[in-house]
């Protein structure tokens, strides 16, 4: 676990199927009393005029910092129990390009050889996203971490934050953060190219991948059926004779061997089209010029069958291609799974969007739709019986802040949003949205069990809100997918 490897893989889909060698932990400003409107200025502890945002004796790496606060307060990071911080900077400098590696780093590295004072806190690893400030610069630490911030006695400038960390199973493999330049040029150019075209991959053909065309017509069409072992890199397909309403009934399925599908998802929900179908491009999914793109890697060890089927028996046409590597995946490669869910909103309690009581693997993302508009619910993610992440509002989970607005990035976005301010109007029965989030460096591993939910904020006025989603996971062994019920299509209308 080192800064170079983590930085070059900020958007690496091949991280998802690799064996788990770390744990995940988030520190956030959520309100322990459950009031989602007070999810700010909550700290691990307070000492004088300093609040501790995150603290652990373990070794690992910070892989994501999110905040909705741009106030100029000082942030300091310590590792290994040191009394002197290795980073001492104003909070906005981690996001807005004002970082100065000559004065804000205390790592022993000589930065005078370059004019680029902002490295490594540079775009596209840092930036603002629809009101939020997000930093993806990986910051490894050895033998402990403490992150603290100065307190500001002003209720109008509360600190909302997430600090996502990987905790290493093998601490000796962690190389502490020093901010050196050895990997700057490659990693920045690579990340910039992904932001320019998230759907583009360049090296698969060099690795021997071959294109497998497919086409068919009927109420079920097999896109790919391969014996033995291999790795499907991506699928691209176009549909004919399928309206948006009928897209709700069309399912993409993936089966390993002769087992029931481990992946079973409505095509419309996958592509954030529960209400409207808009063009978008993420690293794993996209819809561009009438073509659907599915770029979750699909390793398989004992045959794979990928199909499209209409659960209502409607005939459709499809043509496209799969990119296939005819080689056995490395030992321990994880298998792609889905968990689809739907809740019409009858009970204001919890919306569970992933539930695997007996499994091992990684949680890597979510496609989510909501109607009417709602945002002030917090995600609660539990791995192996322990809560490892709590959120501060649903839009915060999707790397936004202060509401949902249409936006797209390689790892998160909101292709569809309808409704206008004020919040009260949206919260109480108007508007809808569809959003996606992919976890790369910050994928959440588990070894025995996993559950993820949004805790509804128990406002009786919100009974009747509905949710639909597909979660994406990679597991060590095939399990049967949880499929969304057929009646969700009656809810999926932009009314």
Positions of PLM-derived features:
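Beta-strand-centric surfaces of beta-sandwich/beta-rich domains
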Residues: 1-495
């Amino acid at each position: 676990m080192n800064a170079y490897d983590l930085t070059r893989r900020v958007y690496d889909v091949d991280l998802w199927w690799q064996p788990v060698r770390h744990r995940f932990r988030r520190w956030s400003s959520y309100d322990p009393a459950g009031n989602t409107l007070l999810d700010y200025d909550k700290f691990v502890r307070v000492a004088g005029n300093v609040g501790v945002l995150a603290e652990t004796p373990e070794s690992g790496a910070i892989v994501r910092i999110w905040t909705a606060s741009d106030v100029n307060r000082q942030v300091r990071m310590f590792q290994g129990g040191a009394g002197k911080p290795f980073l001492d900077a104003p909070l906005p400098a981690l996001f807005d390009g004002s970082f100065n590696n000559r004065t804000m780093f205390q790592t022993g590295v000589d930065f005078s050889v370059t004019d680029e004072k902002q490295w490594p806190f540079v775009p596209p690893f840092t930036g603002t996203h629809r009101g939020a400030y997000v930093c993806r610069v990986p910051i490894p630490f050895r033998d402990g971490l403490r992150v603290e911030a100065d307190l500001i006695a002003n209720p109008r400038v509360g600190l909302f934050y997430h600090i996502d960390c990987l905790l290493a199973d093998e601490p000796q493999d962690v190389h502490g953060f020093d901010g050196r330049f050895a990997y700057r040029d490659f990693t920045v150019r690579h990340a910039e190219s992904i932001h320019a075209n998230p759907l583009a991959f360049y090296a698969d053909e060099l690795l021997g991948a071959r294109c497998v065309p497919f086409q068919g017509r009927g109420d079920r069409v097999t896109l790919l059926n391969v014996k033995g072992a291999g790795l499907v890199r991506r699928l691209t397909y176009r549909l004919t004779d399928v309206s948006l309403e009928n897209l709700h009934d069309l399912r993409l399925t993936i089966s390993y061997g002769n087992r029931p599908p481990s992946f079973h998802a409505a095509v419309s929900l996958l592509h954030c089209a529960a209400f409207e179908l808009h063009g978008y491009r993420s690293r794993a999914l996209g819809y561009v010029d009438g073509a659907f793109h599915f770029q979750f890697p699909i390793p398989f060890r004992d045959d794979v069958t990928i199909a499209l089927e209409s659960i209502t028996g409607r005939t459709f046409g499809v043509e496209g291609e799969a990119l296939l590597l005819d080689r056995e995946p490395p030992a321990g490669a994880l298998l792609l799974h889905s968990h689809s869910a739907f809740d019409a909103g009858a009970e204001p309690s919890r919306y569970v969007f992933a539930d695997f009581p007996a499994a091992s693997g990684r949680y890597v993302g979510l496609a989510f739709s909501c109607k009417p508009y709602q945002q002030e619910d917090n995600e609660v993610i539990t791995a192996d019986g322990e809560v490892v992440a709590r959120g501060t509002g649903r839009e915060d989970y999707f790397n936004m802040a202060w509401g949902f607005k249409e936006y797209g990035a390689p790892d998160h976005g909101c292709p569809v949003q309808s409704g206008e301010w004020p919040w009260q109007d949206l919260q109480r029965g108007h508007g809808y949205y569809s959003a996606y989030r992919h976890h790369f460096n910050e994928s959440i591993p588990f070894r025995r069990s996993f559950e993820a939910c949004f805790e509804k904020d128990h406002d009786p006025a919100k009974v009747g809100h509905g949710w639909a989603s597909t979660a994406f996971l990679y597991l060590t062994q095939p399990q049967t997918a949880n499929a969304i019920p057929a009646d969700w299509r009656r809810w999926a209308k932009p009314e």
